[in-house]
């Protein structure tokens, strides 16, 4: 889906501020406790303190429970585009419910909003599926940490199968395998 804005305006600092406000809106509306998994560029911005920014926050959740009305309130308060936070990724090839299994708690806001980040290896696999220029840049950053942790091509393939059930989305483009092999060489 095309975004309402093309400028990357969401950074670690304002993402934290918006999540804090979102927690306040959740409390105000009384919709209960929420757990959100952040993936994509926003996960990279929150994980790596390299000044990364993004055009939106890609989220995954198991229960929506009127969360979007709170998100729209945050958008109105800060003058953000309606799609500043969205779950479009849940309708993409790179999504898998297995992403929740290894997610890491980033922060809890106001004891009502838990924000999780996709595990580095899962994020790497997601970016292998998408394989856009901005994903390739993120994969460079992720590969450095994965190499340090002894992650090999075989480990990536095993994790890929855990997420997607088979290797089809990896093997559908030979460039992905070659790229991954080159990145994970020690």
Give short role names for the model-derived ranges.
Residues 1-38, 42-186:
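Compositionally biased terminal segments of proteins
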């Amino acid at each position: 889906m095309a975004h309402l804005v093309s400028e990357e305006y969401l950074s670690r600092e304002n993402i934290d501020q918006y999540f804090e406000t979102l927690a306040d809106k959740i409390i105000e509306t009384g919709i209960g406790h929420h757990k959100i998994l952040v993936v994509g560029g926003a996960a990279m911005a929150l994980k790596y303190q390299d000044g990364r920014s993004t055009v939106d926050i890609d989220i995954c959740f198991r229960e929506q429970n009127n969360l979007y009305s709170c998100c729209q309130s945050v958008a109105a308060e800060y003058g953000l585009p309606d799609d500043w936070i969205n779950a479009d990724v849940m309708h993409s090839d790179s999504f898998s419910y297995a992403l929740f299994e290894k997610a890491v708690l980033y922060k809890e806001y106001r004891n009502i909003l838990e924000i999780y980040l996709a595990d580095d290896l899962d994020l790497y696999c997601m970016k292998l599926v998408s394989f856009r220029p901005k994903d390739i840049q993120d994969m460079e950053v992720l590969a450095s940490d994965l190499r340090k942790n002894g992650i090999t091509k075989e480990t990536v393939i095993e994790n890929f199968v855990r997420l997607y059930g088979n290797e089809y989305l990896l093997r559908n483009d030979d460039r992905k395998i070659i790229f991954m092999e080159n990145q994970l060489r020690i």
